[in-house]
Amino acid sequence: AIVTDIDETLIDNSPYAVQQSLKGQDYEQPSWEQWTAKADGDTLAGAKTFLDYASSKGVKIFYLTNRKESERAGTLANIQKYHFPDATNEHLILKTAESSKEGRRQKISETYEIALLLGDNLADFSSVFDKKSIETRNSNVSQQAAEFGKRFIILPNTSYGDWESAAYHYQYNTTPAEKEAIIKRILKKAN
């Protein structure tokens, strides 16, 4: 089986980010749920072609996302709109009580061998990346290096993700100004 994330892996949500930016706002759950209910996200280049190819070879596809159960209808409609393979309720696995995807991956692995994981966030691959400091995440990437490009296929997401949360130590009440100062402090500059 292939286990894939949805947001910024298969579906492009940049119109939502633009909408929020034009309003001078960051991500917020109510507006996000309005966006996902529209089922209006476009596909990212190559996503459907790749999954269609895998499906044609008998590989089952599971869509593992941290979208909430209240977003199921819109999420399913969005992936069905583009005829992604195995786009069914059974293969759409939404967020449970915890945001870690590990338990949900383990549940899939009870029935299927997971050959490949696709995502835009390290936590899409293994719990060793869940809520860890930047230093620990970097160390774990080094330890898991052999998996990248073979079993773990990561698509860069420079807009958001746990890389950003790790920078401010998962303190989600950090103000936008504080976040900006932290990010500017840790950015790598070109020589």
PLM regions: where:
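Alpha-helical substrate-recognition element adjacent to the catalytic core
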Residues: A1-S99
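C-terminal cap/substrate-recognition subdomain and adjoining C-terminal extension
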Residues: K68, R72-N191
